[in-house]
């Protein structure tokens, strides 16, 4: 793919521009305009405002009914960058997860494929807000799907990638490409549980309904539930908020417990959701207080489809060479909202080695520009193999 290599400098500079001008989830207005402008320049049909700030590019060639989708995320994180290079972030947030590179890499493939021969339809999904949810608790992928992106832009298969610092793939640092059959990444749910009691003076607890005591019982019950009823899932209490540090004689009205749950089975995540609600309501009833359980995040496990996996595996071996691919690495307990696409359409998710960079979400992280060529080559191979005559 010599012509692809000739595009490297152009998209390296584009990646640096996107990095320097990051935008948070559902606010990727300028990034989306840039993506749309580039796709139009390359000859794609362009559809904007899908999933609020998402963009879809469509390229049809030949007469085949076959179709394939590729996805990249566009949003940045609310982190102050600590790098001092010339293209460091300007906006008080930063691309600390490499979505600048994902976007530039898919655009690089888009330009290459615009001049390639294939038979079918290519749909490119540039997604907002992988890192956050909107007021309806919908992430960017979920919002695009709710906006009927997959109904309007039908695909037989959909594929996505993420860069991964080698330090986060211990034991596989020398590989370029990582993918596994079945469960790739965990699903995640987050909860805020508010116990509303009756505050008062610490000298008269009998006149109060102490929410701290109730919330403490709830936390203990959660960890008992965790040890007795869960198999592969991880449940952690990550916050306990109550009272004030400005006085010692006040029993507060409310106590809040924050919970993070990660699991490899969507069925078990649903079971955990049911049990958290049951336990919270049961303890609140036992101590005669009120309780509100709010789910703050709900991302399903990322599960690679077997059929799509076989297609992706062949493309990866062609792109990287079999010795540079790892197909048996352990699943990760991190989560990825690409799972929403995989819940609707056959597809796979994979990692590409970002080399010796700082870890994801670190203020000194930077996307490795060499991954632009690796990602665009993999994406292009997927398309040309599947949409061949």
Residue ranges, per PLM feature:
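Short, small-residue-enriched loops and turns at beta-alpha junctions
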Residues: 21-26, 77, 132, 244-248, ...
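Acidic/His- and Gly-rich active-site-bordering loop/insert found
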Residues: 1-95, 100-120
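Non-cysteine beta-strand/loop elements that form the S-adenosyl-L-methionine
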Residues: 69-71, 191-193, 349-354
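Divalent metal-coordination and catalytic microenvironments
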Residues: 18, 57, 70, 99, ...
